[in-house]
Amino acid sequence: MSTVNTVTEQLTRAGQAIEHGSFAIIDEEAGPHAYTDEQWPIVRRMIHANADFDFNGLTRFHPAAVRAGIDLLLGAKARGGAHIVADVEMICVGLSAPRLKHFGVQTHQFISDDDVIERAKAEDTTRALRMAC
């Protein structure tokens, strides 16, 4: 029985084949781009998740962003875990549970919490803005 690298691969051969095929189509359709070898897999996955090729060219990275993210993930378990807070549930649902577990990362979103809703109503603002404060 072979072990699947759940960090970079889908869990099944069929899933891997579909993802690899999709990524090949995206690479072909996107053509040349100005992203680094570290940045392109992120942009390609954004295109894959949204079926929106406009992410190619619109996405910008701080020069240290990718390295900072990798360092955070690699050190998360040693620090007792890490947390991703999102403003919508869809982000949390869209993240791979095996990958999150591998790195010791937990996701959280509070957009539907009663206190967030009540505070947003009281201050006549959005729930996402209330979460950020």
Question: Each PLM stretch: what is its role?
Answer:
Residues 94, 99-133:
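Long, charge-dense
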Residues 2-85, 89, 93:
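Electropositive, gly/pro-rich neighborhoods at or near active sites that engage anionic ligands
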